[in-house]
Swiss-Prot record:
Residues 1-70 form the U-box domain. One of its GO terms (cellular component) is nucleus. Belongs to the WD repeat PRP19 family. One of its GO terms (biological process) is protein K63-linked ubiquitination. GO terms for molecular function: ubiquitin protein ligase activity; ubiquitin-protein transferase activity. Homotetramer. Component of the multiprotein assembly MOS4-associated complex (MAC) at least composed of MOS4, CDC5, PRL1 and PRP19 which is related to the PRP19C/Prp19 complex/NTC/Nineteen complex identified in other organisms. Associated with the spliceosome. Keywords: Coiled coil, DNA damage, DNA repair, Immunity, Innate immunity, mRNA processing, mRNA splicing, Nucleus, Plant defense, Repeat, Spliceosome, Transferase, Ubl conjugation pathway, WD repeat. Residues 107-141 form a coiled coil. This is Pre-mRNA-processing factor 19. It is an enzyme of class 2 (transferase). WD repeats lie at residues 219-258, 261-300, 306-345, 350-389, 392-430, 435-474, 481-520. It holds the Pfam family WD40_Prp19. Its EC number is 2.3.2.27. It comes from Oryza sativa subsp. japonica (Rice).
Length: 527
């Protein structure tokens, strides 16, 4: 009398009328409630088809093995043998699993190495392809038949115009629509933007002091000439007299990579967060576009040689698809970033002054340039026409910065900083932080438009006010390089720190002591 489900002697046996099978009542009831079928034959079955089996009420006898001591010892011996066999089987399974895991880990390591190699080969192939794409048009133009002019000379009519200048494709209507749409969107967003509550307060900035110093450039050619901060990754890029650009991770205090390729000092550089690109301009008359890889390295994908003199400034448009370079050859170039092509090169026939600084307006339709002749020029990007000129500086305009409020422009020169109201096209304030022999080398608004940083013989931070109110000095940070020449000043996110570059090789971070615990172990260096 064995239950057809459990294989045990049932305590409350029942029989199916249809199949005649014996079941434990509680088991078959539960199965019928869930499925409505016989658990063995799968026929339709209800509780009405189940008949209870009447048995005698007797005491269940004890098993013979448990009725004596020898029987109990035999049972224990059998149980022990079963446990030993099970343990042996488990040890064998564990050994097999360890072997399989070791094999899988070796396979994973080999796969990772192969993937890394393939990625490296892919990046190299991309760089070669981009270089080939730039070389093919030039080679095709060189191989194309040329027209013979009356004096017997040959000219490339598709590249050079009658005036001897290269013919550029220009900014087409589609690009103009894109620039206009970007301007409309950013302008509307800027008007709604409020000062973030996380912005560093005046009291906090008054307590700023040097929290770290990092030797990034060579000792035999010291000097940081340009600087930029990645808007989302807290990476600081510096360009030096040693011809190198260094990418520095501020939170970890480590150098991510050093970009080499220019033959002279790097005068300007900018991040292009879109597609992890990076642009550098140099005194060697070239501009390089660098492509970042997943491993953190940067490869040069374009080398642009459209200028005939030192490239002094690089500024990236808000769309992150275009950028402008300004040079001492008295021209500025508008580039398409993906193709690395110069869409237009703008120069003025009158005057021989070169450009020393340039910056896009935050909304993107206005470009500001500073010249060696102390003139600030405002350009309409869509038409490439000079729409305004600001005069009054003494010496070359070394730096400029548009405020995020959209209507303040700060420019720096030998005589200090001049503040311009773009709504009325006039100078409403002049800040002269240093004596007449000390030029102002850097000027920078923070992203909120609440503070203005000035770099010269030291670093000074001013509170931004309106046209009528005084712009108060908040903090003076000494130049700890010993050179007496601060060349670059940049605000970190929410003005939580200030990055300063000087004519030594060290990048210095000023902030509130204790706010950046990750930088506490960094050793200051005054070499």
């Amino acid at each position: 009398m064995i239950c057809a489900i459990s294989g045990e002697v049932p305590d409350e046996p029942v029989v199916s009328k249809k199949s005649g099978l014996l079941f434990e009542r509680r088991l078959v009831e539960r199965y019928i409630e869930d499925h409505g079928k016989c658990p063995v034959t799968k026929e339709e079955l209800t509780m009405d088809d189940i008949v209870a089996v009447k048995t005698n009420k007797v005491v269940k006898p004890r098993q013979l093995q448990a009725a004596s001591i020898p029987g109990l010892l035999g049972m224990f011996q059998n149980e022990w043998d079963a446990i030993m066999l099970s343990s042996f089987a488990l040890e064998q399974q564990l050994h097999t699993a360890r072997q399989e895991l070791s094999h899988a880990l070796y396979q994973h390591d080999a796969a990772c190495r192969v993937i890394a190699r393939l990625k490296k080969e892919r990046d190299e192939a991309r760089a070669l392809l981009a270089q080939a794409e730039r070389q093919i048009p030039a080679s095709m133009a060189g191989a194309a038949p040329t027209a013979v002019v009356s004096n017997g000379k040959r000219a490339f009519e598709d590249e050079v115009g009658p005036d001897g200048k290269k013919i550029r494709p220009g900014i087409n209507p589609v690009m103009i629509d894109e620039l206009t749409e970007c301007n409309t969107m950013l302008s509307a967003h800027r008007k709604k933007r409020q000062v973030p509550p996380t912005l560093a307060s005046i009291d906090a900035i008054e307590r700023y002091t040097q929290i770290s110093s990092h030797p990034l450039h060579k000792t035999n050619k010291p000097g940081i000439l340009s600087m930029d901060i990645h808007p989302s990754k807290d990476i600081i890029a510096t360009g030096g007299i040693d011809t190198n650009a260094v990418l520095f991770d501020r939170p970890s205090g480590q150098i991510l990579c050093t970009l080499t390729g220019h033959s002279k000092k790097i005068t300007s550089l900018k991040f292009v967060p879109r597609d992890e690109l990076f642009v550098t301009g140099s005194a060697d008359k070239t501009v390089k576009i660098w492509q970042g890889s997943e491993e953190g390295n940067y490869n040069c994908i374009h080398t642009l040689k459209d200028h005939t003199a030192e490239v002094e400034a690089v500024t990236v448009h808000a769309t992150q698809k275009y950028f402008v370079t300004a040079s001492k050859d008295n021209t500025w170039c508008f580039y398409d970033i993906p193709s690395g092509s110069c869409l237009t090169q703008v120069g003025e026939s009158s005057g021989q002054e070169g450009y020393t600084s340039a910056s896009f307006h935050p909304d993107g339709l206005i470009l500001g340039t500073g010249t060696t002749e102390a003139v600030v020029k405002i350009w309409d990007v869509k038409t490439q026409s000079n729409v305004a000129k600001f005069e009054g500086h003494v010496g070359p305009v070394t730096a400029m910065s548009f405020s995020e409020n959209g209507y303040f422009l700060a420019t720096a020169a030998l005589d200090g900083v001049k503040l311009w109201d773009l709504r009325k096209l006039r100078n409403f304030r002049t800040i002269s932080p240093y004596d007449s022999d000390t030029p102002t080398n850097s000027v920078e608004f923070d992203f909120s438009g609440s503070y203005l940083a000035v770099g010269g013989s030291d670093t000074r931070v001013y509170q931004v006010a309106n046209v009528k109110l005084e712009w108060n000095l908040v903090k003076t940070l000494p130049d700890l390089s010993g050179t007496g020449k601060v060349t670059n000043v940049k605000f970190g996110t929410d003005a939580k720190y200030i990055a300063v570059g000087s004519m030594d090789r060290n990048l210095r971070i000023f902030g509130h002591p204790g706010e950046d615990d990750q930088m506490d172990d960094a050793k200051p260096s005054e070499e």
